[in-house]
Amino acid sequence: MCAERLGHFMTLALVLATIDPARGTDATNPPEGPQDRSSQQKGRLSLQNTAEIQHCLVNAGDVGCGVFECFENNSCEIRGLHGICMTFLHNAGKFDAQGKSFIKDALKCKAHALRHRFGCISRKCPAIREMVFQLQRECYLKHDLCAAAQENTRVIVEMIHFKDLLLHEPYVDLVNLLLTCGEEVKEAITHSVQVQCEQNWGSLCSILSFCTSAIQRPPTAPPERQPQVDRAKLSRAHHGEAGHHLPEPSSRETGRGAKGERGSKSHPNAHARGRVGGLGAQGPSGSSEWEDEQSEYSDIRR
């Protein structure tokens, strides 16, 4: 079913591609200018390109990098897949058994996904580009790129070239994934890219590395502020202890006041005040007991 649909689509695309130049000479449809044509090609894959890629995908073999070569020359400027494939194959002998298995399975996964998804995707360049990068990430993660990189770090580092990061987005996507594969892999790749950058750009790379270190500095700030937080906690604890010791002199004064009140004839509720001062604040229950005593006292007087 899918093969039939691809065949019909290719035939229709080829027919439309042959009709399109003749339609541009019609009096009611003036030919497009160079700017319009270039902007249209950048925003959408041309019908001729679509038909060529479809034809290439059908004829490409399952082994090798033929499927990825189909995307090298297109108006959406999606390049780099073929280069990554060739780099992996050329360095496959340097990998251990796990690394070789990863290369075989990941390349096969990417080729299979490209062949099946391309016919179902829009011709808009952003949609095609996102599809390519998404399936690439899926295949790398599915077949455990990080495990292969951790066991073959030296070979992985040798495969990464600074100039490829400037020209091909799939390389950037691959390196970004590798940077998440642990500190050892991350440090090795970062050092290699910085050295290559200095060889190509000279002192400009030193400026970029300085900016990067300045950006990465804020996360180290919290440990420096930690002693201040500890000092603040100690200060609060000191004030808390002082607060706990404050009631002692007040209780003594309350005791002295109670003795003085005992010696003099005071109002009946002075006893209640002395009790509140000696035992601390009692809340609603203390006030209700005092009211009960007052009511009993008034009943006796009656």
Curated annotation (Swiss-Prot):
One of its GO terms (biological process) is negative regulation of gene expression. The modification Phosphoserine is found at S250, S251. Residues 1-24 form the signal peptide. Glycans are attached at N73. GO terms for molecular function: enzyme binding; heme binding; hormone activity; protein homodimerization activity. The modification Phosphothreonine is found at T254. Keywords: Disulfide bond, Glycoprotein, Hormone, Phosphoprotein, Secreted, Signal. InterPro entries: Stanniocalcin (IPR004978). The keyword Glycoprotein applies. Residues 227-264 have a biased composition (Basic and acidic residues). It is found in: Secreted. Residues 23-44, 218-302 are annotated as: Disordered. The keyword Phosphoprotein applies. It comes from the Eukaryota. GO terms for cellular component: endoplasmic reticulum; extracellular space; perinuclear region of cytoplasm. Belongs to the stanniocalcin family. Homodimer; disulfide-linked. Has an anti-hypocalcemic action on calcium and phosphate homeostasis. This is Stanniocalcin-2. It comes from Macaca nemestrina (Pig-tailed macaque). The lineage of its organism: Eukaryota, Metazoa, Chordata, Craniata, Vertebrata.
